[in-house]
Amino acid sequence: MRDDSLLTDVTLIAAGYEVKAHKAVLASCSPYFYAMFTGFDEKNKSKIILRDVDPEALKLLVNYVYTSEVEVTEENVQTLLPAANLMQLSDVKEACCEFLLNQLHPTNCLGIKSFADLHGCLDLLAVTNTYIESHFAEVLDCDEFYALDQEQVCNLISSDTITVPSEEKVYESVIAWVNHDKPNRGQALPRLMEHVRLPLLSRDYLLVSLAINV
């Protein structure tokens, strides 16, 4: 029925892309659209502009409203989840979170953590934090670690539940993070070292390390 535009009464627009739909169908599946079409100015409008929504995500979500089917992929999950979150399509949001959960790896877990935090995916965030703590040594060797800012590194290495073979790994990761952009990160070293358990490092190790890195 929607494909034929039969009796459609609203056009959703995202970045110039248009999708025709029925207000009643959208409102029945989405609290976001229910509120829009019953209590806001948009209830009398035939065209609705959705800002910050990816056009392909809009297409997939409107199709989901009519079919209860959506395919989450590596290519669309980062645009689909925010759009589903906005439209309060909780089943799609959960499907996206489940997909990301199954994709967790030392090379991407920091990015997934940030993404989950940004979009309020609390269960995914909790599982990701646990994953990072248990794979901490591997995470420190991945590119995402070097893209963190100072505050994020502090939060990461200050956890009491991280799993590392020795505190030397944490110390070396801090030095490596600073050296990755030393002109801009050098001043952060003293604060970062506040979170390294220096008493767990041997005196000889520290002396050798300082001689190399000073």
Model-found features: residue ranges?
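Canonical BTB/POZ domain core
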Residues: R2-N108, C121, E133, Q150-P183
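BTB/POZ-protein C-terminal extensions
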Residues: S114, L118-V214
